[in-house]
Amino acid sequence: MFIYDTKLKQKVPFEPLVQNKANIYVCGPTVYDDAHLGHARSAIAFDLLRRTLELSGYEVMLVRNFTDIDDKIINKALKENKSIQELSSIYIESYTRDLNALNVKKPSLEPKASEYLDAMVGMIETLLEKNIAYQVSNGDIYLDTSKDKDYGSLSVHNSSIEFGRIGLVQEKRLEQDFVLWKSYKGDNDVGFDSPLGKGRPGWHIECSSMVFETLALTNTPYQIDIHAGGADLLFPHHENEACQTRCAFGVELAKYWMHNGFVNINNEKMSKSLGNSFFVKDALKNYDGEILRNYLLGVHYRSVLNFNEEDLLVSKKRLDKIYRLKQRVLGTLGGINPNFKKEILECMQDDLNVSKALSVLESMLSSTNEKLDQNPKNKALKGEILANLKFIEELLGIGFKDPSAYFQLGVSESEKQEIENKIEERKRAKERKDFLKADSIREELLKQKIALMDTPQGTIWEKFF
């Protein structure tokens, strides 16, 4: 298994800290709004990583957090006259619904930052004791990055423009010094009583503490195998996580760092500041979650994905082929490449090379259908074919529906009954040899985007886009 390590900037063999086990921490959302396609892409990318590792024989522990203490949450909660707990719980539920619709496997653990305040305070106390952290006059506590000789080694970022994003404070020793603890500033602020005084943790200390509490190994030079997240988190978030972990514990946070690429909308980076965010819940109004998942996984996870509906509909054809084959093999069977599972898994073991994996999948679908055409009555390989289709489901998280349910997505029960009535009416017209009437019914349904297919078992139908 090979993965691309952001820190080394190259593909490297995956060699876990504990044989046949993989510990992964994925930075989850700050829960002050609904999930957008960038959140969905990150979740799907590392869901693919997890599935690939599991099918390669690893026991995977994947933790994805919720940041439920943050300035954005506080500001929105104040604006909407809610507590931060009320607001964050709304968006945690929304995020969970969206990811369930995208068939993302539930993490092993989903810690909330608010549940690990003691660990955060303890880590900050350690940094103060080591004289690596310092307090300014308003009570805020910062980490002195000059004490970490390896600061910047992950992101190779030293741009003053980037440091400007962090915000300049007059008493900070260096521009890149980052806040560990924000002291309580009075009304409209949120604070928790602690040995550090009343206040709340900074963003970066939250994730490091949760890694340490949920996944960290003892007596190793690294705390976990893989730390993952979106490319936008590389700096300053992941750089600062790595820094404070070295300073507090004398170890590296992760052996490997993985980052997924951005989602662009009309060739422009998707962001709330640009007003072009595309929420998952809105996309799900137009497309089934499996169709959306199939599209988002179709571009290599490290590449930028330029979202557009034309490409989404093109990618849906791949999903159609999977279900078309599944539909055929459930009744009529033929042969399939016996090395298919090995070949497609090897593609995914090469830094999640999904493009190559999908090429192997396309080849399998094509060759299997050809064999079915040549020998439609061969049932000897039914188990093998269905097992390979099941493998696609487990590896890529697609192809798990019943074919009839997939091809009839977006059709209500009352509409289904009307279609079945029309099919029965058409059948009677053909029995009377009233072929004009039969053709008119077919044309009528086509206008409703319903295609009819006559098979030896009877007429079946499907909805098209």
UniProtKB/Swiss-Prot annotation:
Binding-site list for ATP: 272
What's the domain of life for this entry? Bacteria
What protein does this entry describe? Cysteine--tRNA ligase
Report the sequence similarity comment from the record: Belongs to the class-I aminoacyl-tRNA synthetase family.
GO cellular-component terms in the record?
Answer: cytoplasm; cytosol
- Taxonomic classification, please? Bacteria, Pseudomonadati, Campylobacterota, Epsilonproteobacteria, Campylobacterales
Compartments (UniProt record): Cytoplasm
For this protein, what is the EC number? 6.1.1.16
Q: How is the cofactor bound?
A: Binds 1 zinc ion per subunit.
Q: Which residues bind Zn(2+)?
A: 27, 207, 237, 241
Species name: Helicobacter pylori (strain ATCC 700392 / 26695) (Campylobacter pylori)
The UniProt keyword set, sorted, is:
Aminoacyl-tRNA synthetase, ATP-binding, Cytoplasm, Ligase, Metal-binding, Nucleotide-binding, Protein biosynthesis, Zinc
GO function term, MF aspect, one = ATP binding
So what does this thing catalyse? tRNA(Cys) + L-cysteine + ATP = L-cysteinyl-tRNA(Cys) + AMP + diphosphate
Residue ranges annotated as coiled coil are: none
Example of a GO biological process term: cysteinyl-tRNA aminoacylation
Question: Which enzyme class, named as a word?
Answer: ligase
Per the record, what is the consequence of mutating residue 332 to N?
In strain: ATCC 49503
- Note the effect listed for residue 440 to H: In strain: ATCC 49503
